[in-house]
């Protein structure tokens, strides 16, 4: 992926403002509520039977924070995201057997939560476009092992 200076600045500026615990918990909760078939990957998380159970589940929040924290690896390796995520791609493909489309679904949930948090002044069209491109690069890197 090639980044313009504007895209790189938009992504890095936004990333500095993101609270990974807050956005991670919200995004993971949304994923599990909106796409209930994803529950099968999180059987060890306990009660995922209702939206309120999901949103108050500490394991959901912790995993969401872990996922968001993992984006820091992509931030620090924006020019080589695929290689930075090689091991995670192998793990999700060969050990966890995660449907690679779930990465895209989670990216959408993350984007919704970020947009809701920062609003249209900070998360304007240009920032949204750069952020989307960034998350699609991460999604592609995570799905790499499946190809």
UniProtKB/Swiss-Prot annotation:
Red blood cells. Heme b binds at residues 63, 92. GO terms for biological process: hydrogen peroxide catabolic process. This fish has two hemoglobins: cathodic and anodic. Cathodic Hb has high oxygen affinity, low cooperativity and displays a small reverse Bohr effect. Anodic Hb has low oxygen affinity and cooperativity and displays a normal Bohr effect. One of its GO terms (cellular component) is blood microparticle. This is Hemoglobin anodic subunit beta. Involved in oxygen transport from gills to the various peripheral tissues. CDD domains: Hb-beta-like (cd08925). Keywords: Heme, Iron, Metal-binding, Oxygen transport, Transport. The keyword Heme applies. One of its GO terms (molecular function) is haptoglobin binding. Residues 2-147 form the Globin domain. Heterotetramer of two alpha chains and two beta chains. Belongs to the globin family. The lineage of its organism: Eukaryota, Metazoa, Chordata, Craniata, Vertebrata.
């Amino acid at each position: 992926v090639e980044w313009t200076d504007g895209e790189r600045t938009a992504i890095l500026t936004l990333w500095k403002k993101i609270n990974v615990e807050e956005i991670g918990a919200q995004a993971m909760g949304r994923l599990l509520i909106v796409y209930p078939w994803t529950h099968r990957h999180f059987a060890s998380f306990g009660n995922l039977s209702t939206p309120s159970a999901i949103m108050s589940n500490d394991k959901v929040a912790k995993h969401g924070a872990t996922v968001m924290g993992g984006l820091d690896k992509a931030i620090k390796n924006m020019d080589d995201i695929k290689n930075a995520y090689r091991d995670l791609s192998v793990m999700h493909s060969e050990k966890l057997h995660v449907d690679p489309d779930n990465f895209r679904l989670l990216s959408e949930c993350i984007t919704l939560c970020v947009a809701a948090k920062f609003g249209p002044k900070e998360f304007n069209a240009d920032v949204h476009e750069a952020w989307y491109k960034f998350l699609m690069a991460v999604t592609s890197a995570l799905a790499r092992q499946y190809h």
